[in-house]
Amino acid sequence: MEVAVPVKQEAEGLALDSPWHRFRRFHLGDAPGPREALGLLRALCRDWLRPEVHTKEQMLELLVLEQFLSALPADTQAWVCSRQPQSGEEAVALLEELWGPAASPDGSSATRVPQDVTQGPGATGGKEDSGMIPLAGTAPGAEGPAPGDSQAVRPYKQEPSSPPLAPGLPAFLAAPGTTSCPECGKTSLKPAHLLRHRQSHSGEKPHACPECGKAFRRKEHLRRHRDTHPGSPGSPGPALRPLPAREKPHACCECGKTFYWREHLVRHRKTHSGARPFACWECGKGFGRREHVLRHQRIHGRAAASAQGAVAPGPDGGGPFPPWPLG
């Protein structure tokens, strides 16, 4: 006498033998060597993605859908996978049906559960498995939520005393263990980050330099500071250290200013005497330095060029007269 196989078991058998499950359950022990293992894995992947039938966009959608489902919480992932979405848009539609609006009318962020959440996979157990449905994160033989089990799907509800959800994250992706700073309310997903943030409020500087005793809040700041001490591995070598100040042996007897070169001292002392030994041959104006009178004579040259179209020649037929010392 034949025993009829229930529809639920038949659907599970198809799912467990799907190309996606064969690809995910692959182990190196399934092949005699690494080269054979790579070839077998490549063949299993082709059986799942079927590049001869699907376009690149369709295969990419399968990979995106798998990663999207693996990022969901375990209970939500089990419920969405039991509906066998064929694309990311179908998975998003199921999540919107499950989680509903972001907040209920009374102001809380509780989410509603559709009527068929606890119906289990029997409602869709007769759906044919095409081998394209990646049940990401579900172990072989795992069943969906059992009928009548009220604990199968428990959507996350933020309690009034719980910290606020992480900004920028959807409600179903914010972990219930998210912590926030009691001082300013800043939310952190990692306790280590929160601990380091709270040190900024207390002013605590637990990391002290053994060389000079200066304290720092973060360890990397201390490491960077220790490199500035001479002899440390990160301190600059002799070639990178600033050179000592050079001696300036030539000093002015009037103001005490010192110079490296004697010529600079001689030129400086003329500023105290007020002497202007260089005169312009055009207007007779005197200057203390030769380069100043040369710069001044360019003004006369430009004026003459604009008035006559050429610069007035000097005594030898060349350019303007060079400056000569007065007296």
UniProtKB/Swiss-Prot annotation:
Q: Which InterPro entries match?
A: SCAN_dom, SCAN_sf, Znf_C2H2_sf, Znf_C2H2_type
Report a single Gene Ontology molecular function.
zinc ion binding
Can you give the residue ranges of the SCAN box domain? 20-104
Q: Where is the composition biased (Low complexity)?
A: 134-148, 305-314
Query: Tell me, which GO biological process terms does this entry list?
Result: regulation of transcription by RNA polymerase II
Query: What residues bear Phosphoserine in this entry?
Result: 18, 104, 235
Give a yes or no for keyword Zinc-finger in this entry: yes
Q: Which SMART domains match?
A: SCAN (SM00431), ZnF_C2H2 (SM00355)
Would the keyword Transmembrane turn up in this protein's UniProt record? no
Q: Which CDD domains match?
A: SCAN
Q: What does this protein do?
A: Transcriptional regulator. Binds to the 5'-flanking critical region of the SCARF1 promoter.
Family annotation (PANTHER family) = ZINC FINGER AND SCAN DOMAIN-CONTAINING (PTHR23226), ZINC FINGER PROTEIN 444 (PTHR23226:SF150)
The UniProt family comment states:
Belongs to the krueppel C2H2-type zinc-finger protein family.
Q: What is this protein called?
A: Zinc finger protein 444
Origin organism is Homo sapiens (Human)
Gene name tied to this protein: ZNF444
